[in-house]
Each structure stands twice: as structure tokens, then as C-alpha cells.
Amino acid sequence: MSGASRVFSCRIYGVLREDGKVLLTRSAFRGSSFINFPGGGVEIGEGPMSALLREFVEETGLAVRPVRALYSSERAHLSTQAPIQIVSAYWLVERVGGKLRAGGNDDDVLDLLWADPARLPVEEMFPADREFAGYLPNFLD
């Protein structure tokens, strides 16, 4: 192992499926936008499940309950803030309360959209989410 320091960003996302579609976010990033699943970074001192619940409410207005783990990163993905490496986990969640904020959260989320799991807009996703999106239909059968 080399002496270089390693910095990781632990990220956790929820997959909410209703009426055969999954909920996605469109978020602002450096003057552009991208699509991913509701969720985000685990903060220092916070556990992954707490982060998932917090991020879901912040981004969508919905309270959710984790149902089961779906996937975790298989490959190394560099953050846009290299040399940070992203480690992502994806959980199936179910809605338990709240009200969907269809127009975003007036912060980083511009919009919420529902998509067929087999036809996700992967061309608008970052590589880590694109990796997971390819497996998603198999996890929901």
C-alpha cells in the first residue's frame, strides 16, 4: 500500500418504487443538471440509515423506511472533487409519510420525476449511479 492518503465520500441513496416507477431527482451542479436517486453524503458522526432518512426528506419532502439493501459500489468512482473516491449504497425504501415536493427543494434539487426502472435517463447520471441503474430492473423483480 502506498503512503498516499485516501479520502472517501460515503453516499447512500433510496429507491422508492410506486406504480411501477422509481423516484429520481434532477439536481443543479456547476451550471448544469444531473439525475440521480434521492440521497447523498453521510456526514461526520452520522450513520448511513440516518443519512438516508435525512437526505430523502430534504430532497423530496417524504419520510421513508428502509426495506432492504439493493447494491453497493463495485468499482472505484472518483468524485468531481478528485482525488475523493465515492462509495455508494442503494436501498429500497417505502413511503411512510410526508408530502412530495414536486418542484424540488429550493436548494440543490430542481425537480422530481418518476421513471420506468428499465428506461432510466442514464445519459444524465454520474458514473456511480449509471453503474447501479444497469442492475436496478433485476433487483426489483
Language-model features and meaning:
Residues 63-72:
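A short coil-to-beta-strand element that immediately follows conserved catalytic motifs
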Residues 75-101, 113, 136:
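Active-site-adjacent beta-strand/loop module that shapes the phosphate/pyrophosphate-binding cleft
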Residues 1-23, 92:
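Conserved N-terminal beta-strand and adjoining loop/helix that marks the start
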Residues 92, 102-135:
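NUDIX/MutT-family hydrolases
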Residues 2-6, 82, 104:
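Short Gly/Pro-enriched turn/cap motifs at secondary-structure boundaries
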